[in-house]
Amino acid sequence: VNTLSYKTKSAKASDIEPKWFVIDAEGEVLGRMSSRIAHVLRGKHKPNYTPHVDCGDFVIVINADKIRLTGSKMQQKEYISHSMYPGGQKRITAENLLVKKPTAIVENAVKGMLPKTKLGSRMYKKLFVYAGAAHKHEAQQPEPFKF
């Protein structure tokens, strides 16, 4: 009996060849799109996915300023930050954040769906979000990602 035939193969970092994907966020629902992006950044869409290895792909998100939130979340959803000084809590609605920094909503949603470890930080660095339709990664020849 060949014992190697029924053993699980773990992917090595040297074996993985990352691809580049571009996603158009225009008209997409924030949470659904973000979970798919996190799925690709982790590498779970690949058959050789290994939890302890960064086997994810690079993702470019364009038109992040045209993202869609369902219901009345655009006016009611609040992003809270704190300066660590007394009384330093700041709140901003999704509507105002979209005007102030359009990429922050997508970045925040995807970051929350990735592991909170060193590996998760490495995965997050493979995400590039742009407010407009133009991006500076044409040299990598990204292919459109189909949902």
Residue spans for each PLM region:
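Short, highly charged C-terminal tails/helix-capping segments
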Residues: 129-137
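Ribosome large-subunit tunnel/peptidyl-transferase-proximal elements
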Residues: 1-107, 118, 136-147
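C-terminal structural segments of small proteins and small subunits
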Residues: 114-130
